[in-house]
């Protein structure tokens, strides 16, 4: 009887255990968690090679049993193959695995990884469950197996890339391969850089020289390119930071901006969104990586330069306009500058609508303006702000049928109207050349700029060539804006004055040298002022001295505008050079001349409907104030008769066609003019 009872008991125990053991067969094992730089890195051993979905849970108390999952937070899910570096494996044609830790061992094909970004400070525990394809989630929890037993302290911080390996890319150049796992949550230190968590994005670092030769170049690839493209810009010993604008679907890339919150990164069938919001995920990731590189490598943060062709050129233009405080200067070749303008372009709206929606809808973004305004460089160039815009050296082709030529005209107009400076070259080239100029020969121009040194933004030079109307048959076939005038790099930037030596400049083409003009006028706006700090509304004095004979040929007063800009218009530049001095009234050794002409200021350089115009009259006599188009035709008169002091005028352009317009003020034989751009 005893033996019979024992046998029955064994059968009963096996009957109870077998279903339990079978249920546990889907449980992951070896769960490990490490927290650093605001992210928790979870790895585990998988129950099988393929066909699994994993769910990641967290709680502030230990997860010991299935019932504990009820109160736990589901932070994410992932599928098979997270151990495998799909991007690099495809690029190199061989299998690569991720490493969780810098210089740590690569994961094996029986492991998985998930990276969770912390959104609060505190202690956490984690558990991971598995679900086989066609089955249900196995919610078994075994402490120390698929649930962490060790208390983990998490804190909010900016995520950092993890070093993976060294790769030889070209000519014995060694690129340090890093991976930044994405976050879809905004924190105080870093905005979301994807709409999914734990997606691996590559970046690369090519180590360069120590100080003082520690220049950093930001290398942005063209559409369809990759982070392994790290061509040297000036020297093979330059530091280089590469990025990867990569979408694992037919849309290829986000044009260095981002995509809709509901966009599926791995789908080829994304529908065009009609509602919701577009976010600058890629832009946020790029800015974060620039900050990481300048903080963690021995590079000079004052000498960071962006460089790129095609979509890589677009990267530079929009970086200069939106994050100009992070880059000293930008070199851009054949860039797309308006993602809503496809005139004379092989690109077309349907290529981008799954990411951004249709231009007619113009969905909102997380950056304060509709998406197609944010992706229009002319709009960004016209934004009135104290925010720094980096200088741009740009090349465009009038016969470029990939990105199109017509889009450049409103952008050029906005840059000039808002006195942003930079140089804009063009010739008759297509997207890949050849043309009448050598774009590569201008790369060296960006090296004169530093983030910690003032420079003069030159605009509206009288010797500018004519880019035309956007029709490739109109305007000059080869030309440039503001390339016919130059300055001496020894700029005076003191507490009481700012000075620069201006001089005419010759233009190099493939057919020879275009001689420098013997005389020109140009608008000058000091940028990145270090010591000559002035406040809006301050009245300053200026003089222009002809260097050939030392004569002060012209001078006057200029008012600091609401955005702290000092804009001196129509400065004469002579063959032997002109020294422009801007200073506080009453500086020792400098006279205090009376105002010689009216002062004009407008609250925005690009006007959509209305603008506020300010005028300061130098005397008390008869005065005129009128609006003109580019042909010189007077459209409206705001003032005719005696005037004195200061006045504000509301300028309504709602019924005016888009284009460039001038306001001219005259009194006592002296006049001043101001130009702005109208867009609708």
Where are these predicted regions, by residue range?
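Alpha/beta-hydrolase active-site loop
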Residues: 267-298
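Recognizes extended acidic, P/S/T-rich segments that occur
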Residues: 55-122, 134
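C-terminal tail/sorting-segment detector
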Residues: 611-613, 637, 642, 650, ...
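Residue-level detector of functionally pivotal "anchor" positions at catalytic/ligand-binding pockets or at interdomain
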Residues: 584-614, 618, 679
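Alpha/beta-hydrolase-fold serine-hydrolase catalytic core, especially in secreted/extracellular enzymes
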Residues: 166, 170-172, 176, 417-579
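Pro/Thr/Ser/Gly-rich low-complexity, intrinsically disordered linker/stalk tracts
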Residues: 24-52, 135-163
């Amino acid at each position: 009887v005893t033996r019979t009872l024992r046998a029955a008991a064994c059968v009963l125990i096996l009957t109870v255990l077998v279903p339990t053991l079978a249920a546990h067969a889907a449980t992951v094992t070896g769960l490990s968690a490490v927290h650093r730089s605001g992210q928790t890195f979870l790895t585990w051993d998988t129950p099988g090679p393929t066909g699994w979905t994993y769910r990641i849970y967290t709680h502030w108390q230990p997860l010991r049993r299935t019932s504990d999952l009820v109160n736990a937070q589901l932070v994410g899910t992932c599928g098979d193959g997270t151990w495998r570096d799909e991007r690099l494996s495809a690029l190199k044609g061989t299998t690569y695995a991720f490493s969780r830790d810098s210089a740590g061992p690569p994961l094996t094909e029986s492991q998985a990884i998930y990276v969770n970004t912390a959104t609060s400070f505190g202690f956490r525990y984690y558990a991971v469950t598995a679900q086989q394809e066609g089955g249900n989630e196995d919610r078994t929890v075994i402490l120390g197996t698929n649930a962490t037993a060790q208390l983990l302290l998490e804190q909010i911080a900016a995520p950092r890339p993890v070093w993976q390996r060294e790769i030889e890319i070209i000519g014995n150049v060694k690129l340090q391969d890093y991976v930044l796992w994405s976050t879809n949550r905004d924190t105080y230190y870093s905005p979301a850089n994807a709409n999914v968590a734990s997606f691996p994005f590559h970046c690369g670092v090519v180590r360069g020289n120590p100080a003082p030769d520690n220049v950093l170049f930001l290398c942005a690839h063209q559409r369809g390119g990759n982070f392994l493209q790290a061509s040297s810009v000036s020297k093979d010993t330059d530091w280089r930071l590469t990025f990867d604008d990569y979408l694992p679907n037919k849309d290829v890339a986000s044009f260095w901006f981002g995509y809709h919150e509901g966009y599926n990164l791995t789908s080829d069938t994304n529908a065009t969104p009609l509602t919701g919001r577009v976010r600058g995920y890629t832009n946020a990731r790029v800015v974060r990586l620039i900050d990481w590189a300048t903080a963690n490598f021995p590079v000079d943060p004052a000498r960071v330069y962006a460089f790129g062709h095609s979509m890589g050129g677009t990267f530079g233009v929009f970086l200069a306009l939106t994050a100009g405080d992070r880059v000293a200067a930008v070199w851009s070749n054949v860039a797309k500058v308006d993602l809503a303008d496809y005139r004379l372009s092989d690109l077309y709206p349907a290529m981008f609508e799954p990411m951004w929606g249709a231009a007619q809808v113009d969905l909102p973004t997380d950056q304060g303006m509709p998406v197609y305004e944010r992706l229009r460089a002319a709009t960004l160039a016209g934004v009135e702000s104290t925010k720094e815009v980096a200088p741009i050296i740009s090349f465009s082709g009038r016969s470029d049928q990939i990105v199109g030529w017509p889009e450049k005209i409103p952008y050029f107009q906005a840059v000039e109207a808002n006195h942003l400076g930079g140089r804009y070259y063009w010739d008759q080239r297509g997207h890949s050349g050849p043309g009448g100029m050598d774009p590569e020969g201008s790369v060296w121009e960006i090296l004169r700029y530093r983030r910690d040194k003032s420079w003069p933004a030159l605009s509206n030079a009288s010797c500018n060539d004519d880019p035309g109307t956007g029709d490739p048959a109109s305007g000059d076939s080869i030309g440039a804006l503001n390339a016919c005038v130059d300055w001496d790099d020894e700029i005076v930037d003191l507490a009481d004055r700012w000075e620069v030596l201006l001089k005419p400049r010759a233009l190099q083409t493939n057919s020879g040298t275009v001689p420098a003009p013997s005389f020109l006028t140009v608008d000058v706006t000091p940028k990145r002022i270090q010591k000559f700090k002035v406040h809006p509304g301050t009245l300053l004095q200026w003089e222009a001295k002809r260097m050939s004979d030392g004569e002060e040929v012209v001078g006057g007063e200029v008012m600091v505008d609401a955005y702290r800009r000092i804009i001196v218009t129509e400065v004469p530049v002579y063959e032997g050079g002109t020294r422009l001095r801007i200073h506080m009234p009453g500086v020792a050794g400098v006279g205090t001349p009376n105002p010689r002409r009216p002062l004009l200021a407008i609250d925005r350089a690009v006007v959509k409907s209305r603008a506020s115009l300010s005028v300061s009259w130098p005397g008390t006599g008869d005065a005129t104030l009128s609006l003109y188009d580019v042909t010189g035709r007077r459209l409206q008169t705001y003032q005719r008769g005696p005037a004195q002091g200061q006045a504000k005028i509301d300028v309504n352009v709602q019924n005016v066609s888009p284009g460039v317009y001038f306001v001219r003020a005259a009194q006592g034989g002296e006049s001043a003019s101001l130009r702005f751009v109208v867009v609708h």
